[in-house]
């Protein structure tokens, strides 16, 4: 019985340790990546997994050690895994809609550093210019779609008027 308890404690400790390692990797990704989209990806994917592993390890440990099953831990696991990706998706969508900086391969410096920041390589004017260009593209696409819809509507009206003219000639 003592060996089983030690094995379960070892599994719980291993899960907590893996969760910690993944959290450190997530922190490095947040610091290393240049824009809000890459940072949100790094933080959401790995931190969700790290919290999952850590809380499952804690749940296993306390269930084994004190014969206490915590519904709060189980609910927190479910809640974090449901809300974290959704919340970060909303943050990324808001950043995109406001014209946030988007990293491009040609923006990459010749050598990368773990302390790389977008502020070092991009001025405010550049970011505003990219946001303006993106907004112009969106407007152009919107107006092109509107023109296409107007053409389709005009064609439908022409077809209807031709069919009415044919009906009148038959009568």
Curated annotation (Swiss-Prot):
Localization per Swiss-Prot or TrEMBL: Cell membrane
Keyword Transmembrane: yes
Pfam family, any one: PhaG_MnhG_YufB
Swiss-Prot/TrEMBL keywords: Antiport, Cell membrane, Ion transport, Membrane, Transmembrane, Transmembrane helix, Transport
TM segment ranges: 11-31, 51-71, 72-92
Residue segments, region Disordered: 144-171
Composition bias type Basic and acidic residues, residue spans: 144-156
Coiled coil: none
CC per GO annotation: plasma membrane
Topology versus the membrane: Multi-pass membrane protein
Annotated GO MF terms: sodium:proton antiporter activity
InterPro entries: PhaG_MnhG_YufB
Assembly description: May form a heterooligomeric complex that consists of seven subunits: mnhA2, mnhB2, mnhC2, mnhD2, mnhE2, mnhF2 and mnhG2.
PANTHER family registered for this protein in UniProt: ANTIPORTER SUBUNIT MNHG2-RELATED
Similarity-based family: Belongs to the CPA3 antiporters (TC 2.A.63) subunit G family.
Name of the featured protein: Putative antiporter subunit mnhG2
Lineage: Bacteria, Bacillati, Bacillota, Bacilli, Bacillales
């Amino acid at each position: 019985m003592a060996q089983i308890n030690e094995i379960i404690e070892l599994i719980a400790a291993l899960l907590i340790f893996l969760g910690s390692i993944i959290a450190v990797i997530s922190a490095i990704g947040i610091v290393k990546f240049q824009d809000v989209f890459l940072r949100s990806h790094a933080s959401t994917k790995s931190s969700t997994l790290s919290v999952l592993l850590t809380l499952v390890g804690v749940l296993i440990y306390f269930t084994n050690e004190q014969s206490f099953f915590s519904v709060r831990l189980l609910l927190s696991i479910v809640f974090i895994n449901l809300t974290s990706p959704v919340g970060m998706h909303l943050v990324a969508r808001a950043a995109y809609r406001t014209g946030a900086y988007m990293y491009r391969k040609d923006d990459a410096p010749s050598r990368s550093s773990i302390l790389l920041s977008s502020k070092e390589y991009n001025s405010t004017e550049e970011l505003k210019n990219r946001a303006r260009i993106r907004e112009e593209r969106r407007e152009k696409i919107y107006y092109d779609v509107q023109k296409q819809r107007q053409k389709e509507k005009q064609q439908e009206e022409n077809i209807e008027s031709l069919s009415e003219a044919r009906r009148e000639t038959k009568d």
